[in-house]
Amino acid sequence: MTILKWALIFLVVSIIAGIFGFTGISAASADIARILFYVFVVIFVVLLILGFTIFRA
């Protein structure tokens, strides 16, 4: 269940980065937040798949 916990953490982080990046708070932080959003979404999906397949007890 540890991998799934990390997957959920990365999901929350990606949502927070998306909130800051997609609402137009500032131009500089928006670009960084958009990049972080997509990075964390990819990490979330990878960890979610691994949690349900390889790392299952």
From Swiss-Prot:
Keywords: Cell membrane, Membrane, Transmembrane, Transmembrane helix. Belongs to the UPF0391 family. It is found in: Cell membrane. The keyword Cell membrane applies. InterPro entries: DUF1328. The chain crosses the membrane at residues 6-26, 35-55. It comes from the Bacteria. One of its GO terms (cellular component) is plasma membrane. It comes from Rhodopseudomonas palustris (strain ATCC BAA-98 / CGA009). Signal peptide: none annotated. NCBIfam families: PRK13682.1-1, PRK13682.2-2, PRK13682.2-5. It is a multi-pass membrane protein. This is UPF0391 membrane protein RPA3029. It holds the Pfam family DUF1328.
